[in-house]
């Protein structure tokens, strides 16, 4: 079903711009540089199609395959480039990543410390990536469809970002996150 009253919707003061959008879709060709994506915001990047070559901070460089989720904190050294044509959805966060009204990533780190006798497991040499479960694949598929149709108001973006965080908290363990 097409979006109704599209002109009214697009003329609204709350219609998201490239600068204000909390979600953006990227359909990129081979060897496209994406190194500035986390310059002003932290980014949760879902790779729906293709591959990315990524270096993040002091971690070992690695190739990210489709179906993976990667967190790119703001202002951490990051270089990224597409391998072949790629499609991904980026979710931008200004502050902490709120996983629900009760937890954010810092709270989860505290919970993991409590479970492990106040010690975190030793850091990996490779930055973490998360395989996307079918519930998140469905979420991103619906989100992509809605954005393609032009449903792009800031209220929609905020609600979908809250939904994403609740799904992450609901379908993944503390250690996974």
Model-derived segments and their meaning:
Residues 123-177:
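An amphipathic alpha-helical interaction segment
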Residues 4, 9, 41, 66, ...:
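Histidine (H) residue identity feature
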Residues 6-12, 59-61, 128:
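Hydrophobic alpha-helices of bacterial signal-transduction systems
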Residues 2, 29, 46, 122, ...:
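Generic signal for short, ordered secondary-structure residues
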Residues 15-121:
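N-terminal regulatory/effector-sensing and dimerization cores
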Residues 1-18, 149:
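A short, N-terminal "cap"/entry segment at the start of jelly-roll beta-barrel domains
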Residues 2-4, 114-125, 174:
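Short, charged, low-complexity loops and linkers
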């Amino acid at each position: 079903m097409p979006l109704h009253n599209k002109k009214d919707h697009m003329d609204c003061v709350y219609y998201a711009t490239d600068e204000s959008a909390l979600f953006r879709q990227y359909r990129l060709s081979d060897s496209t540089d994406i190194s500035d994506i986390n310059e002003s915001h932290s980014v949760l990047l879902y790779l729906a199609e293709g591959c990315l070559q990524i270096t993040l901070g002091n971690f070992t460089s690695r190739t990210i395959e489709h179906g993976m989720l990667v967190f790119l904190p703001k202002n951490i050294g990051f270089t990224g480039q597409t391998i072949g044509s790629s499609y991904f959805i980026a979710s931008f966060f200004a502050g902490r990543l709120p996983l629900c009204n009760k937890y954010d990533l810092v709270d989860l780190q505290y919970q993991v410390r409590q479970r492990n006798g106040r010690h975190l497991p030793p850091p990996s040499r490779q930055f973490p990536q998360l395989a996307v479960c079918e519930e998140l694949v469905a979420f991103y598929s619906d989100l992509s469809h809605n954005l393609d149709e032009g449903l792009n108001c800031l209220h929609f973006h905020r609600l979908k970002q809250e939904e994403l965080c609740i799904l992450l908290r609901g379908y993944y363990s503390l250690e996974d996150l």
